[in-house]
């Protein structure tokens, strides 16, 4: 089926809270149908200067809520290792643990572009391994694109995947899968290291990546890279100049425990609301208040 979209469809691809070109009204579910977001929409938004949001998501119900909210890109991140499976780092999670999550998200998000993370150990050995891993996510889970970490060192893998028709989102700066070699959770690209970060960004773009995540990179450097690249940049702890922004949804919504990273803004207290609801439910059951007559047949 043709990927060409009419001017009207290009306008309708934006969700209620997504970027809309100047002079156009923001369509809502009631006023205009939404179109499936594709990689070329992100390129168009960069060219027009429209910023957009990406969130991680790991299940059908949350994906449906974010899709309804108009979030255009959803990432089934290897951060599921932490927030779904309870691992200390993202290193242990496997393809087999991620694929069922991607399936659920794809079913719950008919409009969003769904990106699947390639986990540690699934692509580092070379293009063949990367192709095998990415193919599984595309065929078995229905992902629309994959993401992998690294700059120049994974350029061959990115080129291989794009040549095979698999869209690739790159990830540079702080790469969580390499936490053991980076010496912990540290800002990347400071001082002399900035040149390597720039080289990594250029390398992934030239290899064919359709976008690049920059994590924990100085804002000034992220601004410089965003200006150099023709592909969209997505920031997480990389300042406001990136074309898009991404957060782990549990951090964004206040479900994560402990102190949030500096780059996180919490927009809700979902964790607190869940605890309050659970306590009230348990009290109602213990007190014989629930179920009441209106809950019975």
Swiss-Prot record:
Keywords tagged on the record: Cytoplasm, Magnesium, Metal-binding, Pantothenate biosynthesis, Transferase
Cofactor note: Binds 1 Mg(2+) ion per subunit.
Composition bias, Low complexity: 16-33
Enzymatic reactions: 3-methyl-2-oxobutanoate + (6R)-5,10-methylene-5,6,7,8-tetrahydrofolate + H2O = 2-dehydropantoate + (6S)-5,6,7,8-tetrahydrofolate
Gene Ontology terms, MF aspect: 3-methyl-2-oxobutanoate hydroxymethyltransferase activity; magnesium ion binding
Subunit structure: Homodecamer; pentamer of dimers.
Name of the protein this chain belongs to: 3-methyl-2-oxobutanoate hydroxymethyltransferase
GO biological process, one term: pantothenate biosynthetic process
Pathway field: Cofactor biosynthesis; (R)-pantothenate biosynthesis; (R)-pantoate from 3-methyl-2-oxobutanoate: step 1/2
Residue numbers annotated as active site: 215
Organism: Mycobacterium marinum (strain ATCC BAA-535 / M)
Protein purpose: Catalyzes the reversible reaction in which hydroxymethyl group from 5,10-methylenetetrahydrofolate is transferred onto alpha-ketoisovalerate to form ketopantoate.
NCBIfam families listed in its UniProt record: panB (TIGR00222), PRK00311.1 (NF001452)
Cofactor: Mg(2+)
Annotated binding of Mg(2+), by residue: 78, 117, 149
Claim: Cell inner membrane is one of the keywords in the record: no
Keyword Protein biosynthesis belongs to the record: no
Gene Ontology CC terms: cytoplasm
Family membership: Belongs to the PanB family.
Composition-biased stretches (Polar residues): 1-15
Binding-site residues for 3-methyl-2-oxobutanoate, renumbered to this chain: 78-79, 117, 147
Region (Disordered): 1-40
Enzyme category, top tier: transferase
SUPFAM superfamilies: Phosphoenolpyruvate/pyruvate domain (SSF51621)
Subcellular location: Cytoplasm
Domain of life of the source: Bacteria
């Amino acid at each position: 089926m043709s990927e060409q979209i009419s001017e009207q469809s290009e306008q309708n691809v934006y969700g209620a809270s997504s970027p809309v070109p100047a002079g156009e009204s923001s369509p809502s579910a009631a006023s205009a149908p939404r179109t499936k977001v594709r990689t070329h929409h992100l390129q168009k938004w960069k060219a027009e200067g429209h910023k957009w949001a990406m969130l991680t998501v790991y299940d059908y119900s949350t994906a449906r809520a974010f899709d309804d909210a108009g979030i255009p890109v959803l990432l089934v991140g290897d951060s599921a290792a932490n927030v779904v499976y309870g691992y200390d780092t993202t290193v242990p999670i496997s393809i087999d643990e991620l694929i069922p999550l991607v399936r659920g998200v794809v079913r719950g998000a008919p409009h969003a572009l769904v990106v699947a993370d390639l986990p540690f150990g699934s692509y580092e050995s070379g293009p063949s391994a990367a192709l095998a891993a990415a193919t599984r996510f595309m065929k078995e889970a229905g992902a629309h694109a994959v993401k992998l970490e690294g700059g120049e060192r994974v350029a061959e893998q990115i080129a291989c995947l794009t040549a095979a028709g698999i869209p690739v989102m790159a990830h540079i700066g702080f790469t969580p899968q390499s936490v053991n070699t980076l010496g912990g959770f540290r800002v990347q690209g400071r001082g002399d290291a900035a040149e390597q970060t720039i080289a990594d960004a250029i390398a992934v773009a030239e290899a064919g990546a359709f976008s690049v995540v920059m994590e924990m990179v100085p804002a000034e450097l992220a601004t410089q890279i965003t200006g150099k690249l023709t592909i969209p940049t997505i920031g997480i702890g990389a300042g406001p100049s990136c074309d898009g922004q991404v957060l782990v949804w549990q951090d964004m919504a206040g479900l994560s425990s402990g102190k949030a990273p500096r780059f996180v803004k919490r927009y809700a207290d979902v964790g607190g609301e869940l605890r309050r609801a659970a306590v009230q439910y348990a009290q109602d059951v213990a007190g014989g208040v629930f179920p009441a007559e209106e809950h019975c047949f």
